[in-house]
Amino acid sequence: MESIFHEKQEGSLCAQHCLNNLLQGEYFSPVELSSIAHQLDEEERLRMAEGGVTSEDYRTFLQQPSGNMDDSGFFSIQVISNALKVWGLELILFNSPEYQRLRIDPINERSFICNYKEHWFTVRKLGKQWFNLNSLLTGPELISDTYLALFLAQLQQEGYSIFVVKGDLPDCEADQLLQMIKVQQMHRPKLIGEELAHLKEQSALKADLERVLEAADGSGIFDEDEDDLQRALAISRQEIDMEDEEADLRRAIQLSMQGSSRSMCENSPQTSSPDLSSEELRRRREAYFEKQQQQQQEVDRPGPLSYPRERPTTSSGGRRSDQGGDAVSEEDMLRAAVTMSLETAKDNLKAERKK
């Protein structure tokens, strides 16, 4: 592909690019094409003068600008046709009745010149392959034999005029090289405007990225991924909620213990300790159950006589009655303490929730 001559668009000099891409070299310049255009203008003036230099048509012709060129660099089909005659080449309209009667397969031709409004470009066969040498492209575009007819038909549908170039084109390096090898094109060339827009977009994105990196370096904070940031925030919120729940639970337990302590102080005998911890309550319950078991064992154990030994009613009986009273009072006290502890914990927790 590097051996193919391809002039890219400059201004409105597409006619010059079309001819040079066709001939595969810098054969024509704007000055040479302008000279051909002036010759055509002079020939047209002479023909108009044949009707009389004083005629209205002649004066109108002189006032009109040239139809073969303009200041932008545009050149007419007549200029292109005359330029090709220097090389013995001729242009024939592709869709003319004369050419269509010949029924020539497009792949058997050597080159085409295509025109739409003021734009010209060449489609040429180099070696055994066809190439679109449009100067608006960033490079030559490979066209397969099967796609060539469809490509030309598409151009006609879009309003292009297509001319067949007849004659022997000058030899060129690309044609000789591609006679021996075939090229493959992995990526089609883009239009120059698209390439410039793509480069500008990349430049803008690069500038934005650099600004973001500079800002990140200045602040010391850079979030590589927005999703990671959202997940981190969600986890942080969950941890805060868990901490709040744990704090509520600790306050409820503390209030429960305070309430149970107050209840036990109010309901316990004055001889007991003013503050009973949970450990003390547990020890008292164990002592109560052990005493109950010992009493049951004494009742069930048989004595040396068939009747139980009598005991003084005043002392021993009084002591047994006191022990039973102490046991009952301790049992009631434990039950009441546990019940009041649970109720107090519930009430305190509800009050804390309302706050």
UniProtKB/Swiss-Prot annotation:
Residues 279-289, 344-355 have a biased composition (Basic and acidic residues). GO terms for cellular component: cytoplasm; cytosol; endoplasmic reticulum membrane; lysosomal membrane; mitochondrial matrix; mitochondrial membrane; nuclear inclusion body; nuclear matrix. Monoubiquitinated by UBE2W, possibly leading to activate the deubiquitinating enzyme activity. Its EC number is 3.4.19.12. The modification Phosphoserine is found at residues 219, 268, 272-273, 321. GO terms for molecular function: ATPase binding; cysteine-type deubiquitinase activity; identical protein binding; K48-linked deubiquitinase activity; K63-linked deubiquitinase activity; ubiquitin protein ligase binding. GO terms for biological process: actin cytoskeleton organization; cellular response to amino acid starvation; cellular response to heat; cellular response to misfolded protein; exploration behavior; intermediate filament cytoskeleton organization; microtubule cytoskeleton organization; monoubiquitinated protein deubiquitination. The active site is at 14 (nucleophile), 119 (proton acceptor), 134. InterPro entries: Ataxin-3 (IPR033865), Josephin (IPR006155), UIM_dom (IPR003903). Residues 224-243, 244-263, 329-348 form the UIM domain. Keywords: Hydrolase, Isopeptide bond, Lysosome, Membrane, Nucleus, Phosphoprotein, Protease, Repeat, Thiol protease, Transcription, Transcription regulation, Ubl conjugation, Ubl conjugation pathway. SMART domains: Josephin, UIM. Residues 257-275 have a biased composition (Polar residues). Gene3D superfamilies: 3.90.70.40, S15/NS1, RNA-binding. It is a peripheral membrane protein. It holds the Pfam family Josephin. It is found in: Nucleus matrix; Nucleus; Lysosome membrane. Residues 1-180 form the Josephin domain. It comes from the Eukaryota. Changing residue 14 to A: Abolishes deubiquitinating activity. It catalyses: Thiol-dependent hydrolysis of ester, thioester, amide, peptide and isopeptide bonds formed by the C-terminal Gly of ubiquitin (a 76-residue protein attached to proteins as an intracellular targeting signal). Residues 257-355 are annotated as: Disordered. Deubiquitinating enzyme involved in protein homeostasis maintenance, transcription, cytoskeleton regulation, myogenesis and degradation of misfolded chaperone substrates. Binds long polyubiquitin chains and trims them, while it has weak or no activity against chains of 4 or less ubiquitins. Involved in degradation of misfolded chaperone substrates via its interaction with STUB1/CHIP: recruited to monoubiquitinated STUB1/CHIP, and restricts the length of ubiquitin chain attached to STUB1/CHIP substrates and preventing further chain extension. The UIM domains bind ubiquitin and interact with various E3 ubiquitin-protein ligase, such as STUB1/CHIP. They are essential to limit the length of ubiquitin chains. This is Ataxin-3. It comes from Mus musculus (Mouse). The gene is Atxn3.
